[in-house]
């Protein structure tokens, strides 16, 4: 795939790109993370890549590979790769997923990209990760919907994804019938991590998939009695003058408005608890307003430099939010928020590209984070940051992934079971 041309600052000032040209450039350059930066054998998404050299033995990210499937759809639709190339890459990914070590049909957080063997995330987290697996299936189910032609290659792709989807035992993660899902399980440690999945956070997609599953579904009551019965679920308090329907104070990191909603369309989506478009728009507005107010007086923050979410810092990976502000801006926070705050996101995009330029722009798009206060610019790109940039910009531009996911029969049935209302269900 030919590399998009990077231009000098003087060239950009003399001949600035239009909004559409800039979106094209950023999506396409970021796509390279999942195309050229993927594992060389399986094509699954590496957890992270570096600006110039790659670390040996970097594990693949299961959730990031779900975003990779979405990126392949966008790349195919926009003509960066052919339909046949995208099919072949997905087939290679499925080759690894089919032979990988999984646990009651669920995958670990990290695994080897050649053998599919589990790479432990921590001492006790050496087995299934229900949320990472959910992000994987969100992408694979979109791919199953997109590759819909009645030709042998696409029929086989759909069958293979369908088999993985049917074999995922969501019900196992109720621990014998509890009214809540549990995040982790392993053969050696069982449920020792003991992390119940309760809202509000990035895990709405997990409950939706668990209720929608074709074979090992869980009852809808788990959504209401487990997910929604948390002290951090209902909020309805103002922050930065904006009411936040759900979630922790200040809304938490912005990826909460992105991960579940790369496929799940929040426009017009309601249930008894919230209007999810309002939730995500208001969360974004709070994050933006906080960065503009900049109570810590960090250098660089402002109307064209904002966005707090999980990402790399000089001291490691951290979940940035208004109540955990380290002076680090993560470009994915603003760029994946185009559907919710297009004007503010475009201002940030232009500043990132035109003003900060090569300090944060590289072979796979924007690096994971930067701090002008500390004069620090990340050397890394992360799958779970790059993926939502591509997916959410595409949803802003065309709604492609939202249309695919919301048209899936099992998902429509699951939304109805949970009591959701959506224009897609009319």
What label would you give each PLM region?
Residues 2-426:
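Ser/Thr/Asn(+Pro)-rich, low-complexity disordered segments
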């Amino acid at each position: 795939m030919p590399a998009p041309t990077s231009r000098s600052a003087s060239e950009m000032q003399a001949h600035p790109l239009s909004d559409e040209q800039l979106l094209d450039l950023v999506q396409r350059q970021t796509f390279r993370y999942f195309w050229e930066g993927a594992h060389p054998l399986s094509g699954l998404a590496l957890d992270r890549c570096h600006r110039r050299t790659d670390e040996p033995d970097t594990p693949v990210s299961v959730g990031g590979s779900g975003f990779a499937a979405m990126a392949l759809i966008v790349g195919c639709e926009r003509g960066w790769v052919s339909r046949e190339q995208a099919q072949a890459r997905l087939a290679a990914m499925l080759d690894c997923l089919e032979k990988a070590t999984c646990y009651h049909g669920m995958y670990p957080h990290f695994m080897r990209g050649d053998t599919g063997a589990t790479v432990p995330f921590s001492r006790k987290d050496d087995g299934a990760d229900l949320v990472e697996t959910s992000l994987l299936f969100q992408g694979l189910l979109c791919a199953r919907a997109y590759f819909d032609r009645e030709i042998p290659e696409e029929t086989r792709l759909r069958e293979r994804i369908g088999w993985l989807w049917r074999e995922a035992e969501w019900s196992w993660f109720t621990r014998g019938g509890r009214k809540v899902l549990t995040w982790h399980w392993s053969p050696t440690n069982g449920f020792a991590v003991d992390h119940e999945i309760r809202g509000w956070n990035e895990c709405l997609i997990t409950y939706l998939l668990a209720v929608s599953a074709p074979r090992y579904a869980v009852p809808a009551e788990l959504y209401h009695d487990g997910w929604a019965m948390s002290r951090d679920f209902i909020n309805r308090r103002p922050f930065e003058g904006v009411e936040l329907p759900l979630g922790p104070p200040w809304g938490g990191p912005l990826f909460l408005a992105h991960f579940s909603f790369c496929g799940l369309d929040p426009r017009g989506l309601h249930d008894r608890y919230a209007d999810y478009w309002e939730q995500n728009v208001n969360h974004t507005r709070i994050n933006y307003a906080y960065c503009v107010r900049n109570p810590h007086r960090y250098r660089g923050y402002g109307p064209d430099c904002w966005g707090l979410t999980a990402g790399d810092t000089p001291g490691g990976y951290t979940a940035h939010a208004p109540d955990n502000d380290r002076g680090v801006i993560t470009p994915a926070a603003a760029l994946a928020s185009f559907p919710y705050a297009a004007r503010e996101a475009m201002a940030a995009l232009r500043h990132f590209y035109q003003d900060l330029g090569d300090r944060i722009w590289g072979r796979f798009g924007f690096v994971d984070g930067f701090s002008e206060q500390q004069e620090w610019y990340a050397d890394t790109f992360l799958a779970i940051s790059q993926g939502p940039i591509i997916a959410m910009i595409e949803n802003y531009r065309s709604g492609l992934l939202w249309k695919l996911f919301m048209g899936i029969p099992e998902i429509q049935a699951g939304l109805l079971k949970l009591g959701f209302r959506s224009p897609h269900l009319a």
